[in-house]
Amino acid sequence: MVRWLYSTNAKDIGTLYLIFAVFAAMIGTAFSVLIRMELAAPGVQYLNGDHQLYNVIITAHAFVMIFFMVMPAMVGGFGNYLVPVMIGAPDMAFPRLNNISFWLLPPSLILLLASAFVEQGAGTGWTVYPPLSGLQSHSGGSVDLAIFSLHLSGISSMLGAMNFITTVLNMRNPGMTLHKLPLFVWAIFVTAILLLLSLPVLAGAITMLLTDRNFNTSFYDPAGGGDPILYQHLFSKTTLYISFFYLIYKFTLLKYSIYTNTGTTTVENVFNFNNFYLEYNKTYPNTKVPSTSFLEWFVGFTEGDGSFIVSTRGNLMFVITQSTMDIQVLHYIEQELGFGRVIKQGHKTSRFIVQDMNNLYILIQLFNGNIVFPSKQNSFFKFVHHFNKLSNFPTVAIISSLTVPTYYDNWFCGFTDARHPRGCFTCSLLGNSTAYRFRFLLTQKGEMNKEVLISIANLMKGTVRSHSVKDVYEITVNGIRNMEKIIDYFTNHKLYSKKAKSYQIWLEIYESIKNGEHLSPDSRNYLKMKTQQINK
């Protein structure tokens, strides 16, 4: 009980919103059934001709359904659950404010229900228009209670709206610019803005009504120089905003349902290679252009092993260093790009080098705006700065935003292929028991890269932890179910380095264990020997 009362976790609050909305929906449905029973046939039916009671039911039904069912469920429930997940945030921007936003609603609902039972009830209709809501028509405290209820629910909505706006603007993943936000997040964001603009207007309108009823003012009383139309003007502005919010929300959910019900997933390619293709076709008009999938892989591979070098003499160079055992990967890059050269340095090291200024300009167009890690982006910016000084090419305008890779592109495959991230597939058969453990590991240096690593780990259902080496972080994917996601990814995205062989051995062991072959002592010993060959 204490957990639910004091929790500031967005998912806990979202669950509370949904439970509250279901409870309010049952109350609202009861009112709705009463209305329909009364209207089912001409004449008096179940309310014994009590027209005030009918008006009270109509009013309470509207308030409960709009302010305590639809808005808490759609914005508070689904918003708290999905918005932080979709933008890569750990929680809402103001978790304690989130708690307050929810716990203002139960007393608000209690006040509304109380208004239906005080005196003859608030039979004003959900618009609460004067003079029907004035002191002459409803002399008891029912309308006052309904107004207090609207005040509390309005405060709740405004606090929640501020929380959502701040969260979306300030807590997105690195590289997730506004145009890359999912449509659902946009729907919540615009909804929050509309609510924040409209609810203070409604608050002012009902506060003036409250003072008209209790403090002898005459904002809406023509006898004292007031204007009843003023309330309609203020209220219609509020309802216009809220109606617009409903339209945005419904159309967004409709778009989501179309995508999810067709059984297909539409994913926008986050990498933009238009500038690269433009310059490549100018320089090599009769050459086959590299495929998009290769370029995604190449960017990931470069983030692992590539270097943008400015020598002490001011010479510029792009270099990828690999073990000579993987020299075929460098030749593959040379063949696909159509420029650069591969050289051997000693017996163990090989390099792919680009020094020609025309080709460097093409590569700059490739990497500009498509880099994932901040550390690599910093070295790239220095490189471009020197390039702009030395070359006769048009000045390259640096794109400072980072790109977030997805599960459907080849970036992660290229990054795994690289030597320095030390991505590896591991399997352990524990002792003489039938226990086993599958893991996928990937390391990266630099505190500034940690947040990006977390977003990458989320793609593969992994976690990020500090490595034993200082300032190095490790993505770890554990568990047989999560391995299926890894297998699905690398089945659809080809590895080119010696890690391709490691992956095949690892996959064979996985299939053998999945088929139960490890239960046999002889097969288990064979699989143990095979595990030692995975990363050799």
Curated annotation (Swiss-Prot):
Residues 1-235 are annotated as: COX1 exons 1 to 5 encoded. The mature protein may arise from proteolytic cleavage of an in-frame translation of COX1 exons 1 to 5 plus intron 5, containing the aI5 open reading frame. Residues 237-536 are annotated as: COX1 intron 5 encoded. It comes from Mycosarcoma maydis. In the C-terminal section; belongs to the LAGLIDADG endonuclease family. In the N-terminal section; belongs to the heme-copper respiratory oxidase family. This is Probable intron-encoded endonuclease aI5. One of its GO terms (molecular function) is cytochrome-c oxidase activity. It is an enzyme of class 3 (hydrolase). Its main location: mitochondrion. Signal peptide: none annotated. The chain crosses the membrane at residues 15-35, 56-76, 99-119, 145-165, 183-203, 234-254. One of its GO terms (biological process) is respiratory electron transport chain. PANTHER family: CYTOCHROME C OXIDASE SUBUNIT 1.
